[in-house]
Amino acid sequence: MDTILRLSHITKSFPGVKALADIDLEIARGEIHALLGENGAGKSTLMKILCGIHQPDTGTIEIDGTARHFSDYHDAVAAGVGIVFQEFSLIPHLDAVDNLFLGRELRNRWGARDRKRMRHAAAAIFARLGVAIDLDAPIRALSVAQQQFVEIGKALSLDARILILDEPTATLTPAEAEHLFAIMRELKRQGVAMIFISHHLDEIFAVCDRITVLRDGQYVATTDVARTDVEQLVRMMVGRRIESSFPPKPVRAVDAPRVLEVNELQIERGGPVNRFTLHAGEILGFAGLVGSGRTETALAVIGATRAHRKDVRVRGAAVKLADPADALRAGIGILPESRKTEGLVTSFSIRDNISLNNLGKYRSMRWLIDRRGEARTTHDVMRRVGVKAPSIHTEVATLSGGNQQKVVIARWLNHHTSVLIFDEPTRGIDVGAKAEIYGLMRELTARGYAIIMISSELPEIVGMCDRVAVFRQGRIEATLEGDEIDPDTVMTYATAGTRGATHEPA
């Protein structure tokens, strides 16, 4: 094997936590190598060591057989290591050329920025990737996929020979993800080594050569993709066998009360008019392609965005939901797609996040908060949803994705909501945590909660939902239930429109 990167006996500890224990990793030139593990397994810490962001307590890094010590990120870049973070590091108002050469602009002989040379170099990089990018458009005007390609181009412009891709498909459509995989295969052909981090095991099998699994900061195994399967990988990641990610669906009660009725919703004048109902104890899925109107519909219902016409009833009573505060008073909570920026204050503690929308509940005097009562309630809802953390004072930023999602759920339970909207509830969450979230959702519906689940993952829609509203171009094309909920039927409606099924079963 033509080894380009070797990490040997890497150990790293933080106060009270041993993040990595004697980790080995070996990558070949021109190899796409998957790094797998649950959240908290040590993947991010190991990659931050490789990028010079953290320094190991013990262990060595070798590139092309030469031992390297990275004091910071710039040392790693100089050695040929590049990383494309899940959260982009691009400047939105600058174009692709300026983003590629930010801080290292090419100069002419008079010392002025040589825009022509930089533009030519940028065009050559994107030609190497086989992508078309408008070099003069600001980054904010590009699609998410195009921004991803600019990030990759930025790493390649720094002569990266080892490229780390951290959850690169998290915000891409299936077609965009396939385009990314084509780019990865081309870079592989050119000899670039890639470390691919993803929670989507189907992607691992589609594009990777070998897999290394970490668990609880320890090395578990390295195996060829061709010699393993999904069940074996899951067992290696979580240390146990997961029989099924999805809990069994309960028999739907025919007399379950309607807790939410959207009798008329038109977001824009002249646009489609949608109607749907939600019953106590059920999960209603919103399915469709990215941009089909699923999230837009949910946001319009709760008043987060304006609607041209809207008629909403909660438990039979007409309500005016002009903003999310109105929705909250009506008992509707939302777990937004971007939990870190919209659902949580990550610098706050678990206690403060759970109490955030309900501080009046703990007011002991006019301006004082009953901290003991707040702590008791926080402990209670943490136990109910299964948040794993050392204390209620733990900063939310230090939690895994699955535990962060549970904190958002705990907040709404603390507020006595009856309708919960989950927008991409398992995005960026590992296999074991996904199963926990699914189980929690079913526990909530068993207690009478009603859930709307917006998801781009078809297996999730099919495995979790009692009924599914399929969106296409802003319109609910059909509402499916029972045996109608299968991948082929959902995708047919999402891509080709109505074939004559019932629009809104009772």
UniProtKB/Swiss-Prot annotation:
Q: Which UniProt keywords apply?
A: ATP-binding, Cell inner membrane, Cell membrane, Membrane, Nucleotide-binding, Repeat, Sugar transport, Translocase, Transport
The topology of this chain with respect to the membrane is: Peripheral membrane protein
The scientific name of the source species is Burkholderia lata (strain ATCC 17760 / DSM 23089 / LMG 22485 / NCIMB 9086 / R18194 / 383)
Q: So which domain of life are we looking at?
A: Bacteria
GO annotations of cellular component type: plasma membrane
Quaternary form?
The complex is composed of an ATP-binding protein (RbsA), two transmembrane proteins (RbsC) and a solute-binding protein (RbsB).
**What name goes with this protein?**
Ribose import ATP-binding protein RbsA 2
ABC transporter domain mapped to chain residues: 5-241, 251-498
Give the Enzyme Commission number.
7.5.2.7
